[in-house]
Amino acid sequence: MSVNNKQWYGLPLNLIWGYVAIAVFMTGDGFELAFLSHYIKALGFTPAQASFAFTLYGLAAALSAWVSGVVAEIITPRKAMLIGFVLWCVFHVLFLVFGLGRANYALILLFYGIRGLAYPLFLYSFIVAIIHNVRSDSSSSALGWFWAVYSVGIGVFGSYIPSFTIPHIGEMGTLWLALLFCATGGIIALVSMRHTETPRHMQNLTTREKFAELGRAATLLYTNRSILFSSIVRIINTLSLFGFAVIMPMMFVDELGFTTSEWLQVWAAFFFTTIFSNVFWGIVAEKMGWMKVIRWFGCIGMALSSLAFYYLPQHFGHNFAMALVPAIALGIFVAAFVPMAAVFPALEPNHKGAAISVYNLSAGLSNFLAPAIAVVLLPYFSTIGVVIAYTALYILAFFLCPLIRVEQPGFTSDQHAKPFTANAAES
């Protein structure tokens, strides 16, 4: 199949409405991210119980993310996104009505957990569409744009809009508003991706062959050592993103005296920064090398900015301007991991869907492990214990990066690759 050559600063123009759909859908999905843990606590539950709800959600998201790449190849990205879209809307309504509406912790866990299966199917299936419709040597910048629109949705609009709606319609009203955004994003995706192509050989596999391909999403972790190390680095990548969304509202609002709206604006500043840094690092990595950017700017940058996100607010107290400094730093350096999405399929060019599934599983496990670490450490070591744990893991990722041996299409690196031919780049 042919791939797209028309781009605008690395943005594939044939998929532009798919990018818009991701931004709109993730806006709705992101409404809850920075205030739901605090709201569950306000219903009468403990911080550990609030964190556990996010942990269960993250586990469901990890399982869904694991299968999404292969499922998208087998049934097409559009159909996989449809399943995720419908699942999200149905269980969001059940979560609001019977879970939060009745302050029933068991139903909160049940419906919120099941809803966790939805967004990875919608979000990560689009990565499959990108990989198969963009030239290999342009995939890093195209994926940089993917994470940029993700940040626009889940972080910027997903944080700023609630900061204005909560004072007027409250948390529950804001969560109902999220349904409108997700429905709109889902419809845009279904309409705009009617003619998006993916290789058809996967769709013609027998049932047994389909399950075998699905199983490869797990077996790659021990048949390809570079995939295993890449998976660990990808898990570590977004620990602070998902973890700070759970623990920092309690520190900023309950301890330092920030209002919920102020905290949401600090968190939105982090995501706003990633709009530009995702695109920036995606382009830079194609010139400098994927693994150099990930190691030196991603791992080291996140270790330092994670510490700053705790210590600067603790030192300056209720100071909105100073709280923005580590938020912006975090936004700059978390995006330096963007090339990881290109690394996985490059490591397994003949099984790109399975490789993307491992990438997605790793992203989902990050969503699961970040609050899980908080659940374990918060009762004993407070917020600082969680922050130090995240920092130590970023340092671990720094030492794992040299063990990942990837050939970057169109790029010559003494450390990691020999030159790729044009045919090899498209294999």
UniProtKB/Swiss-Prot annotation:
SUPFAM superfamilies: MFS general substrate transporter. One of its GO terms (cellular component) is plasma membrane. GO terms for molecular function: transmembrane transporter activity. It is found in: Cell membrane. Residues 1-7, 73-79, 129-141, 193-238, 285-295, 345-360, 405-427 are cytoplasmic. It is a multi-pass membrane protein. Keywords: Cell membrane, Membrane, Sugar transport, Transmembrane, Transmembrane helix, Transport. It holds the Pfam family MFS_1. The chain crosses the membrane at residues 8-28, 52-72, 80-100, 108-128, 142-162, 172-192, 239-259, 264-284, 296-316, 324-344, 361-381, 384-404. Its main location: membrane. Residues 29-51, 101-107, 163-171, 260-263, 317-323, 382-383 are extracellular. It comes from the Bacteria. InterPro entries: MFS (IPR011701), MFS_dom (IPR020846), MFS_trans_sf (IPR036259), Polyol_permease-like (IPR004748), Sugar_transport-like (IPR052528). Belongs to the major facilitator superfamily. Sugar transporter (TC 2.A.1.1) family. CsbX subfamily. This is Ribitol transporter. The lineage of its organism: Bacteria, Pseudomonadati, Pseudomonadota, Gammaproteobacteria, Enterobacterales.
